[in-house]
């Protein structure tokens, strides 16, 4: 059952249960979320979203891979508001223009925007987690490394000093744990060349691999701690190995 068919009470109960079991973080900058949220993965999605602390994010940027006919490869839908069953959410028009001014491949275009985009599911979850926020949707219609690196570089620069949460939509089936371990090892070794080989080689099992890799690149650039629950013994991740987050590392306090 898709999240749009779940009741408010079901979603809130799942989040509440996970809040009791996890310690919230007030420094999460990135979330990796499945492209579709439903009754089968609500528990694992809640385990991540429930860790959002009291941070008052001004904007949530949702990045996803979605095929379309747009000539430019990084389109952003033109809507001023987007409607969910829980109300309207306003677009951050200024931020959208900032990206459009950054590079020619960012373009305000609706050709890749339809009812199947992941954005709808993510917003419903966010409306149960955050109070007031704006949204920016960025789509990747070409997952070649040139465009993925271009997107990551723009986000690194434009969003670094902004009070923004970035949400990357991607999936990896539960039997691909060795693949996830290999990618994490590549990131930890700071080997961007090997990461691009993984992206371009055609062997990746990740659905939404462009969004996944761009998220890893931004997290690495910002010095964030990347956490995938599937790599830890306390994991309850059963459907998507990539459900996770990246947060600021806590600094030691010396007295």
Predicted regions and their residues:
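Active-site histidine-anchored catalytic micro-motif
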Residues: 1-224, 232, 236-238
């Amino acid at each position: 059952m898709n999240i749009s068919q779940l009741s408010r009470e079901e979603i809130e109960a799942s989040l509440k249960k996970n809040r009791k079991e996890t310690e919230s973080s007030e420094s999460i900058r990135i979330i990796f979320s499945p492209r579709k949220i439903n009754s089968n993965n609500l528990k694992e999605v809640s385990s991540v979203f429930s860790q959002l602390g009291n941070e008052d994010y001004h904007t949530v940027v949702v990045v996803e891979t979605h095929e379309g006919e747009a000539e430019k490869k990084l389109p952003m839908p033109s809507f001023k508001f987007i409607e969910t069953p829980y109300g309207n959410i306003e677009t951050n028009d200024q931020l959208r223009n900032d990206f459009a001014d950054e590079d020619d491949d960012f373009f305000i275009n609706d050709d890749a925007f339809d009812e199947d985009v992941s954005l709808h599911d993510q917003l419903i979850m966010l409306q149960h987690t955050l109070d007031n926020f704006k949204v920016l949707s960025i789509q990747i219609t070409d997952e070649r490394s040139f465009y993925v690196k271009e997107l990551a570089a723009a986000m690194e620069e434009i969003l670094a000093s902004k009070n923004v949460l970035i949400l990357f939509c991607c999936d990896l089936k539960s039997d691909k744990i060795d693949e996830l371990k290999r990618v994490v090892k590549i990131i930890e070794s700071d080997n961007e060349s090997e990461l691009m080989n993984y992206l371009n080689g055609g062997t990746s099992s990740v659905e939404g691999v462009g969004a996944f890799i761009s998220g890893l690149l931004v997290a690495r650039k910002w010095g964030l701690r990347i956490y995938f629950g599937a790599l830890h013994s306390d994991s309850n991740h059963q459907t998507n190995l990539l459900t996770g987050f990246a947060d600021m590392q806590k600094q030691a306090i010396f007295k």
